[in-house]
């Protein structure tokens, strides 16, 4: 079977999660928040296109390296047992080359930006590479994911104003808290399997306090987003829409109350609407 056979291409697409765009959206929203907040207006179409394509490529690369790192684990977990590397539809060598190609394409995009952003992109690649391996060594892999998913924020500021003001880092912390919250919801789905095979996560670390800590992280997210709006001198419409966005967190807390797998997964998916609503708040506020 050649590497370009139909079955192989389908397997590569599944490695990149082309059939599951939620991760791309969760990475895209904070990137858009940052681009519009840094400019206080719509960014140039070229910068916007570079970041949108970059988000797609780097999220895809992250999924590929994640499956490579978990290739001996995924087959033991119900939700991931049919992934391409677990079933042999793609080989580890093919996954490594796919990761390299995706990162290389991302780097070509970054070369269209300023040197400031090119320098920041190196950290993005490092974070994307090390995150999947953290679940073997620490119960805090979600924090590494938060840093990886949030690094597009300083890159967005660097690409537009070549500076990293306080509001950039407040936005980064807001996104970090949000990411840890929703990825803990995601980890709650696999908690029983992870305990059995020895994989670490915040869902395991937080134990019976998981819902309370998720709620605390969501409150921190909102506080920092309100702070960003204040420092950026956004108008009142931003704060009104942001308050509406907070209602999604209330709904998610209700979903995860009984820790049912399907409900926890639905709570995770619901974060797409939170990210979208915050973006709408930014558009109304600038």
From Swiss-Prot:
What's its membrane topology? Answer: Multi-pass membrane protein
Its subcellular locations are: Cell inner membrane
Query: What are the EC numbers?
Result: 2.5.1.39
Q: Provide the transmembrane region boundaries.
A: 22-42, 45-65, 98-118, 143-163, 213-233, 238-255, 266-286
Which catalysed reactions does the entry list for this protein?
Answer: all-trans-octaprenyl diphosphate + 4-hydroxybenzoate = 4-hydroxy-3-(all-trans-octaprenyl)benzoate + diphosphate
Enzyme class name: transferase
A GO term from the CC aspect = plasma membrane
CDD domains reported for this sequence:
PT_UbiA_COQ2 (cd13959)
GO process terms (BP): ubiquinone biosynthetic process
Q: A single Gene Ontology molecular function, please?
A: 4-hydroxybenzoate polyprenyltransferase activity
Q: Does the keyword Iron apply?
A: no
Q: Which cofactor does it need?
A: Mg(2+)
Q: What keywords were assigned to this record?
A: Cell inner membrane, Cell membrane, Magnesium, Membrane, Transferase, Transmembrane, Transmembrane helix, Ubiquinone biosynthesis
Annotated pathway:
Cofactor biosynthesis; ubiquinone biosynthesis
Question: Family per UniProt?
Answer: Belongs to the UbiA prenyltransferase family.
Its biological purpose is as follows: Catalyzes the prenylation of para-hydroxybenzoate (PHB) with an all-trans polyprenyl group. Mediates the second step in the final reaction sequence of ubiquinone-8 (UQ-8) biosynthesis, which is the condensation of the polyisoprenoid side chain with PHB, generating the first membrane-bound Q intermediate 3-octaprenyl-4-hydroxybenzoate.
Q: What is this protein called?
A: 4-hydroxybenzoate octaprenyltransferase
Gene name for this UniProt entry: ubiA
């Amino acid at each position: 079977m050649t590497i370009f056979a139909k079955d192989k291409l389908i397997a590569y697409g599944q490695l990149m999660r082309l059939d599951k765009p939620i991760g791309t959206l969760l990475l895209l929203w904070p990137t858009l928040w940052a681009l519009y907040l840094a400019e206080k207006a719509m960014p140039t179409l070229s910068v916007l296109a570079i970041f949108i394509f970059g988000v797609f490529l780097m999220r895809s690369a992250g999924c590929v390296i994640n499956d490579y790192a978990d290739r001996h684990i995924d087959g033991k977990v119900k939700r991931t047992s049919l992934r391409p590397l677990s079933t042999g539809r793609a080989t580890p060598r093919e996954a490594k080359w796919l990761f390299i190609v995706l990162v290389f394409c991302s780097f070509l995009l970054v070369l269209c930006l300023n040197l400031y952003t090119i320098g920041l992109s190196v950290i993005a690649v490092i974070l994307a590479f090390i995150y999947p391996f953290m679940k073997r060594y620490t119960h805090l892999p979600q924090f590494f994911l938060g840093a990886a998913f949030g690094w597009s924020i300083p890159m967005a500021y660097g690409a537009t104003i070549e500076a990293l003001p306080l509001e950039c880092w407040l936005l980064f912390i807001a996104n970090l808290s949000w990411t840890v919250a929703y990825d803990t919801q995601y980890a709650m789905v696999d908690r029983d399997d992870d305990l059995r095979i020895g994989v670490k996560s915040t869902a395991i670390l937080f134990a019976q306090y998981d819902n309370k800590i998720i709620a605390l992280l969501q409150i921190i997210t909102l506080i920092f987003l309100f702070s960003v709006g204040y420092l950026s001198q956004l108008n009142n419409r931003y704060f009104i829409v942001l308050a509406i966005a907070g209602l999604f967190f209330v709904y998610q807390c209700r979903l995860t109350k009984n820790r049912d797998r399907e409900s926890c997964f639905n709570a995770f998916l619901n974060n797409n609407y939170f990210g979208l609503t915050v973006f709408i708040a930014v558009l109304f506020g600038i």
